[in-house]
Amino acid sequence: MTTMRLMIIWGSSRQGRNGGVVADWVKRHAAEDSRFEVDFVDLRELNLPFFDEPISPFSMAGNNTDYLHPEGKAWAQRVAEAGGVIIVTPEYNHGPTGVLKNALDWVGPEWGDKPVAFVSYGGAAGGARAVEQLRSITVELGLVQVANAIHFVYYRKAFNEQGEPLREETNESLKKMFDEVVRLQEIFNRAG
């Protein structure tokens, strides 16, 4: 069995961010799954500039050598090498973070024909409104969405001291998400 390069994107970059427990939970469980080679992307560390290329990434036709910025070129290559994507996102003002939207905007065709799943966290809505907007954005980028997302409402109270969710069924939901990412990628591989 071949392993899939699973890109996990943590969509927060602010100082004092608290969602690391959520991102670490996803990363840890993916790393324990023999089907995946994990590429964890912390957008604070990635530190992409604001997108300002002279042409759209979709006009580059998947040729990441057309990027003027070396950061954009490297990011496009990294995305191209992923077989699937899980986005871990907080919710800011009923939507995803600006740094996450910027990272998505930097790349065009390299996103295409990859499964994408969402794990969100926040207050009363648990990041669900951010995921709602991300669904519209990612379908436009050519990603194929896993139907079910995981939303952590009042996430600071949702994990124990070991970084595991208090509700055991949440781990099973994550496993089902992983299964669906693999299933969708296998369909793409057969079709391609």
What residues fall within each predicted segment?
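Alpha-helical structural signal in soluble globular domains
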Residues: W25-D33, W106, E110, I137-E140
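Mobile beta-alpha loop/short-helix "lid" or hinge segments that flank ligand
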Residues: V41-E53, P109-E110, L141-E161
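Glycine-rich nucleotide phosphate-binding loop and flanking beta-alpha elements
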Residues: N93-H94, A125
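Short, proline-centered helix/strand-breaking motifs
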Residues: T89-P90, P115
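N-terminal beta1-alpha1-beta2 submodule of the flavodoxin-like/Rossmannoid cofactor-binding fold
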Residues: M1-T89, G95-K101, E164-R183, F188-G192
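Rossmann-fold NAD(P) dinucleotide-binding segment
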Residues: T97-D113
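Short, glycine-/small-residue-rich phosphate/pyrophosphate-handling segment
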Residues: G112-Y154, E168-E172
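A short small-residue
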Residues: T3-I8, P115, V153-Q162
